[in-house]
Amino acid sequence: MATQQPTQTDNSAQAQPPQTNPAKPTEISEPGIYVALTHDHLNYQSVIDRVRSPEAGAIVVFAGTTRNNFNSLPVQHLSYTSYAPLALRTMLTICRSILTKHGLKGIAMVHRLGVVPIGEESILIAVSSPHRQAAWRAGEEALEECKAKVEVWKREEFGGEGGGVWRANRDGAVGVKVDEPRIGKGEVDEKEDEGDSGNGGNDRKS
């Protein structure tokens, strides 16, 4: 009987976060819940309308925006990527749990992908509830759960010689610096195939 050879793991191929297709925005909706990933600008009104209910006495909206610095370093912009099928399932699971736990009438969670300039929104979360206290608590919990669990990565692009750093969404961990050698296009393509960029630890989205 032939002995099966162990498969060699290519660690370099795991270095980059998985990519999403900009041409295919993705979303999932069910009664009281809406989750989406998109490369478009985020629209407050459309997210609020997703959670409107005649039984709700309060709607709370959280907007995460790109700030112009991180640890005193100037940030030019953020760039987000995601493994969309898994991220959407995680977002849906979070929203289902929070909807039930807090007795909400609606919850919507939309995350932007691609480049997000300074001052623009990278995430919108809206919740509606009969009472404001539950809405406040649910909105905060939804944000923290999203940051801790959803499969979205960001790259911070620093000014000057700072370069770029990949980070995931969890607070407190260190990202991985992206080194981009000044070489020809053909060599760049080859390096990308080898996984030249790193997938960071975990840190803030916004």
Swiss-Prot record:
Recorded metabolic or biological pathway in which this protein acts: Cofactor biosynthesis; molybdopterin biosynthesis
Gly residues bias: start-end ranges: 197-206
Residues given in the record as substrate binding sites: H131, R132, K147, K154, R155, E156
Predominant localisation class: cytoplasm
Record Gene3D superfamilies: Molybdopterin biosynthesis MoaE subunit
Gene Ontology biological-process entries: Mo-molybdopterin cofactor biosynthetic process
Matches recorded under Pfam families: MoaE (PF02391)
Region (Disordered): 1-27, 177-206
Catalytic activity: 2 [molybdopterin-synthase sulfur-carrier protein]-C-terminal-Gly-aminoethanethioate + cyclic pyranopterin phosphate + H2O = molybdopterin + 2 [molybdopterin-synthase sulfur-carrier protein]-C-terminal Gly-Gly + 2 H(+)
GO cellular component: cytosol; molybdopterin synthase complex
Gene Ontology molecular function: any one: molybdopterin synthase activity
E.C. no: 2.8.1.12
Keywords: Cytoplasm, Molybdenum cofactor biosynthesis, Transferase
InterPro entries: MoaE_sf, MOCS2B_euk, Mopterin_biosynth_MoaE
Basic and acidic residues: bias regions: 177-188
Polar residues bias (residue ranges): 1-23
Compartments (UniProt record): Cytoplasm
Job description of the protein: Catalytic subunit of the molybdopterin synthase complex, a complex that catalyzes the conversion of precursor Z into molybdopterin. Acts by mediating the incorporation of 2 sulfur atoms from thiocarboxylated MOCS2A into precursor Z to generate a dithiolene group.
Record-stated family: Belongs to the MoaE family. MOCS2B subfamily.
Subunit structure, as described in the record: Heterotetramer; composed of 2 small (MOCS2A) and 2 large (MOCS2B) subunits.
PANTHER family referenced in this protein's UniProt entry, alphabetically: MOLYBDOPTERIN SYNTHASE RELATED
Protein name: Molybdopterin synthase catalytic subunit
Organism: Neurospora crassa (strain ATCC 24698 / 74-OR23-1A / CBS 708.71 / DSM 1257 / FGSC 987)
